[in-house]
Amino acid sequence: MALHIHEACILLLVIPGLVTSAAISHEDYPADEGDQISSNDNLIFDDYRGKGCVDDSGFVYKLGERFFPGHSNCPCVCALDGPVCDQPECPKIHPKCTKVEHNGCCPECKEVKNFCEYHGKNYKILEEFKVCVTLHTY
């Protein structure tokens, strides 16, 4: 038993000697912060507070400039304290609206139907009808 442990110890001591310095990359072992050479030293990130606004994609807007942040269709204005976005009171969508467009700041109803269509036949609202189900056996 002691012989197996001794062989394992020798094996562990021999393996590090087999690894060449070329096999070890500097990326494998990060250096201390003081030893690291940053490739981003030449990048300057400006502070835009009081000078403009930055959107999610990093685009910079001037003070007073109107823009649409992110996926919003509602406009914002770049102010000293950051973007000022007014959310208007949008009209309610009609309950029978079947086609809604989201092109502007508020959703708009483009089509209202007073009937229900099922398999090419029109029915009145709240009109009951039977659905025939045909079962196919193969």
From Swiss-Prot:
Pfam families, sorted: VWC2L_1st, VWC2L_2nd
Subcellular location: Secreted; Synapse
UniProt keyword annotations, A-Z: Developmental protein, Secreted, Signal, Synapse
Record domain VWFC: where: 51-110
Span of the signal peptide: 1-21
GO process annotations (BP): negative regulation of BMP signaling pathway
GO cellular component: AMPA glutamate receptor complex; extracellular space; synapse
Subunit description: Peripherally associated with AMPAR complex. AMPAR complex consists of an inner core made of 4 pore-forming GluA/GRIA proteins (GRIA1, GRIA2, GRIA3 and GRIA4) and 4 major auxiliary subunits arranged in a twofold symmetry. One of the two pairs of distinct binding sites is occupied either by CNIH2, CNIH3 or CACNG2, CACNG3. The other harbors CACNG2, CACNG3, CACNG4, CACNG8 or GSG1L. This inner core of AMPAR complex is complemented by outer core constituents binding directly to the GluA/GRIA proteins at sites distinct from the interaction sites of the inner core constituents.
Function: May play a role in neurogenesis. May play a role in bone differentiation and matrix mineralization.
Protein's name according to its UniProt entry: von Willebrand factor C domain-containing protein 2-like
Organism: Macaca fascicularis
